[in-house]
Structures are given as C-alpha cells and as structure tokens.
Amino acid sequence: MSAAETNQLQESMEKLNIGSTTEEQSAAAATTTADQSAEEQGESSGVAENSASLYVGELNPSVNEATLFEIFSPIGQVSSIRVCRDAVSKKSLGYAYVNYHKYEDGEKAIEELNYNPIEGRPCRIMWSQRDPSARRSGDGNIFIKNLHPAIDNKALHDTFSAFGKILSCKVATDEFGQSKCFGFVHYETAEAAEAAIENVNGMLLNDREVFVGKHISKKDRESKFEEMKANFTNIYVKNIDLNYSEESFEKLFSPFGKITSIYLEKDQDGKSKGFGFVNFEDHESAVKAVEELNDKEINGQKIYVGRAQKKRERLEELKKQYEAVRLEKLAKYQGVNLFVKNLDDTIDSEKLEEEFKPFGTITSAKVMVDEAGKSKGFGFVCFTTPEEATKAITEMNTRMINGKPLYVALAQRKDVRRSQLEQQIQARNQMRMQNAAAGGLPGQFIPPMFYGQQGFFPPNGRGNAPYPGPNPQMMMRGRGQPFPEQWPRPGPNGQPVPVYGIPPQFQQDFNGQNMRPQQQQQQQPRGGYYPNRNQTSKRDLAAIISSVPQDQQKRILGEELYPKIVATGKAQEPEAAGKITGMMLGLENQEILDLLDDDELFNNHFEDALTAFEEYKKSEAAGNAEEQA
C-alpha cells in the first residue's frame, strides 16, 4: 500500500474513535505481569495449553524446511518444521507448521515475522488450532466485502486489530495473487467481532463502502440459498423496449402484487439498457408475474421474465449447458469420426473425401491447413455409422496413397490422447521395473569405492567425491552414518589428473571445480552423502554422454543417479540404492537426462522402482520362508 492509502486507513480508524496506534496497543499488551505463566498465556490466546505450534500460510511453493528454519530459528529454539506436501506429487501445498519449545518464542515469531515476505510472498502466521470444532466455529469470525484491491492481509489486520485480539486474518486472492476484494477476520472473542461489525460496517475504507457481517459457513449459505430459490421474490426482466420509463415498467408489474423495489438499468446518458429488476413483497406475486409475463410480446418485443440469479449461479448454469452440448456432440461423433495422417501435400479435402467415399456416406471430410493454406499432412473424415467407419479403418490404414502409407484410426480429443499416452508410458516403465524385479533385479549399479592407494586415482565419471558403496556392513549403519570417502588428489607438481570417461574438452571444468586439499577433506562433516553443488548442466552432461563409448554412457549416468537415490533417504536396504539405480538405468539415455533435470519426474520413476524392489524383496522373503518350512 502507498503512504497515502496508509494515511487514509489511519484517518478512518480515527473516525471510529480508535486513538491507539500499533505502538500504544503493544504497550498496553506489555502491561501483563511478567510472572504470567505460559499456560495462562495459552488460555488467553485461544490455543491449546502450552502450545508452541504455529501455522505459516501463503508460502511460495519453492519454500522448504531449510528456508523456514533460517527465518524462524533466530527467534528461539525450533523443535520441528514441516512443510505440508501433496501425497502423490510431493509438491508444497503452500503452508507449513513451525513448532517452538517455548510459547513465548511462538508469540514473538507472530509479532515479528507475520506478513513478512518469504521468497517474494508475504507469509501469514497464526497459532495452530488442532481442535477442528474450534476452527469451524463461527464465533468471532467476520466477513468483509467490497475491499479496495490495495488492501492486503497486513492492512486488514492493522485496521481490525483495534477491536480485539485477532487469531487469523486473510484477504482472498485469485491464482495470480490479486485481491478478490473480500476477506475474513477471526477474533478471539465474539464481543470483539460484534464491535468490529458495529463500527466498521458501512464505513469508507480507501474510498469504498465496506460490508462487515458475521461469517456464515458454506454449508449454511447453500442451505439458505436453496431456501431463497424456492421462495424467491426478486425477478429479472430483459429485452424491454428501450423507450420504457420506470413508471411504465412499474405499471406493467403492479397488477401482480405489492412491489417493494424496482430498478431499470440505464446508461450514462440516462437511457434504458433494456433490462431491470422487480422485487415483490411475497413469493406468490413473483411467481404469478413470471408465469403471466415471460415470453409475452410487449411493444413488438418478447420479454424474458425469470427468477433473479447471482452471477456465480448463472455461470454455473452456463457451464452445465456447455458441458451438456459438448457431451452430446461427442456422443454424436463417437465411433464415426476418423483421424487420417501422413497425407501427401497434394491431397486436399475433396481428394480425401473421394478416397474414403466407397466405404459409406460421408458427412464431412477436411484436410487441416496452416495460415498459408498449405496442408499439415493430416485430416478428418466423418461417416454416418460406426460400421462404415470400421470398414474404412480396415481397408485404408497403411494403404499407399501418392507414395505414402496412410495412418487411419478413430479420432480422439487431445486431452484423452495425452492421457492415454502418459498411461502407456507409465505402464511400460512399470512393466520394465516388474520384469527387472521378477528376474532378480539384474544390472545392479555398483558405485566406485576407493581407499586412497598411493599413486592411484579413482575413475569417477564426473570428478565428484566417490559415492557410498554397496558394502552391507557400511550401508547397515543407517541414515546419517558416515560413509568412507576419499577425494582425488592432484598429480605431480599439483597438475590435475585426467578423469576417466570424460573427453579432454571437459577435463578442466571437472578437475578445477572438485579438487580439494586433504586438510579441507578432514574438516568435512561426516554424515552421509552431500550433493555436489558444482553439478554440470543437463546440456553438458548430454554432450559428455554423446562423446564417450556406449559401454561407458550408462556408467556415467549411474554415477549421477546413485547419489540422487541415496539422498532421498528411502532406499534403506543394503543393496537398495544399487538395485534401484540398475533398474532406472534400463530407461533410455534421454529419459534419464530428463529425470535428472526434473525432480518431479525423478520422484515418479524412483517411487515406481522402489515399489518394484520392495515387492521383489517380499516375494524373495516368502520364497525363503517356504523353503525353510
């Protein structure tokens, strides 16, 4: 908000006889006795006893636990942080929970960090309310609408905090972060909410008259809405003669019952726009007016008279109508519309129809063209019956036309086609993983292990630190245990050592970025695998892969996959990381490069491989149990 808007908010608050500023409110809060216990503070704030759990919302999807720890740990000792994620995609849901050891630290975090930007988005912090009945209670919760777009969460909080302690405050926004011009404020007490409604409802905020009222739950609103629909009194009239005045408009509807209000929409020049609203005193009068006047011709025009609807309701009805038409259209062309591709450039719509005409009655045939009118090489042919379409597919698929074999199949919508393709790829990958599991998971990737023999340098494919090996005794130590690691040492006279598997043009980058002195290695914390922060880009890795022999390509890709799999912390079996790496190396090289560059894609493939590995282990254990029996 600008300084002028902030001043206007302060002036509005002064009109309400709210003289205390934020500093004065803080000073008033500070009058609480110093020996007040955390338990008493918890009760006064409406949160659970000794609670130190905070809800942090409005987070950027890129914010993780480490980011939040850096922000919240200076306030006090943090016991735990959890960013809530989608169970399938693992993407952040935009909110998290931060737990402190002390209640006072939670209060301080709310006071100092609330509405502060985190990675470009102002966060919203409040006490975590674990009791669902308390969260859903309407006591103390108010609804504000017709807000100025410039009013954000902080401005709303500053405006309404004068009436009592606020538990949560939010301005609703769209997917682009723009205000929807309404919001909610949840007070600790119902009295504070009543005071806010009494003082702010109808008041001007940033030159807009706002409405403030008690919040009504969606369930109650829908119940009330259905009741209002069944007993409507307000009707909408359109296609009215533009020469109609308000007096003539009222005279038209007055015979049906007592009118409480009437409105005829006009433009800037005061001329009628041809529609308006009439509100009757009782439901029966409104129903009678609709029945008598709808579709009646007045001054040469058929007018429409019906129940007045809210914009949201109208949009929902239009959406349903559109969906019904779309489904009807799909049903009409189901099994009769053919997709034809690999067409010669000389084939136009007429020629296409001529080729398919022997198989039945064609309702339409069209070759798709670009802006210049040139054929795109594909088109559509629609028959009248599924039998004709099936016959055309049987006869015309792979037939040579002008030296090119046609592809003919039933036409599909783009979204259905994409969905089927994704399912086919996923099924193929799962089958590959299952086949690997059924065959005993061959092709286990064995990461290199080196013990620093004098004069010997490890053939690490990218110059990184060697990854933990498949030795069961070392792997069984569990997560967070030290792995043996030896860093490559420089050659004679401090010269970099050539790295096995890397073309000469890439040698300098890998040696220069990853050589470390032995002393620096000894100071390195020993807690398992640490990802290399000087990773080469996907483009460089692709160049490396293309320039080495075939038998070395999978080795280099394996050295990229293995640490990424270990870093997930889910491959805890002694041989799990190596087995899963071996399974994932069964993918095409380009697919591996893609999933190394895309965490979501990697997670999907990793979860499939992990599931296959676990199923294999279960079947193996069951087989061993049967043999012992």
Curated annotation (Swiss-Prot):
Q: Region Disordered: list its residue ranges.
A: 1-48, 503-534
Recite the UniProt keywords alphabetically: Cytoplasm, mRNA processing, mRNA transport, Nucleus, Repeat, RNA-binding, Translation regulation, Transport
Gene Ontology terms describing biological process:
mRNA 3'-end processing; mRNA transport; nuclear-transcribed mRNA poly(A) tail shortening; regulation of nuclear-transcribed mRNA poly(A) tail shortening; regulation of translational initiation
Boundaries of each PABC domain copy? 537-618
Please name the CDD domains in this protein's record: RRM1_I_PABPs, RRM2_I_PABPs, RRM3_I_PABPs, RRM4_I_PABPs
Q: Quick one: signal sequence residues?
A: none
- Occurrences of domain RRM (ranges): 52-130, 140-217, 233-310, 336-413
Q: What are the cysteine partners in each disulfide bond?
A: none
Start-end of Polar residues biased regions: 1-11, 505-517
- Return the PROSITE patterns for the record: PABC, RRM
Major location, coarse class? cytoplasm
The family database entries (SUPFAM superfamilies) matched by this protein are listed as: PABC (PABP) domain, RNA-binding domain, RBD
Recorded GO MF terms: molecular condensate scaffold activity; mRNA 3'-UTR binding; poly(A) binding; poly(U) RNA binding; promoter-specific chromatin binding; ribonuclease inhibitor activity
Q: One cellular component GO annotation, for this chain's record?
A: ribosome
Q: Does the keyword Protein biosynthesis apply?
A: no
- Is GTP-binding given among the entry's keywords? no
Task: Specify residue ranges for compositional bias: Low complexity.
Answer: 20-36
Q: State its location(s).
A: Cytoplasm; Nucleus
The record describes the protein's role as: Binds the poly(A) tail of mRNA. Appears to be an important mediator of the multiple roles of the poly(A) tail in mRNA biogenesis, stability and translation. In the nucleus, involved in both mRNA cleavage and polyadenylation. Is also required for efficient mRNA export to the cytoplasm. Acts in concert with a poly(A)-specific nuclease (PAN) to affect poly(A) tail shortening, which may occur concomitantly with either nucleocytoplasmic mRNA transport or translational initiation.
Record's family?
Answer: Belongs to the polyadenylate-binding protein type-1 family.
Protein name (Swiss-Prot/TrEMBL): Polyadenylate-binding protein, cytoplasmic and nuclear
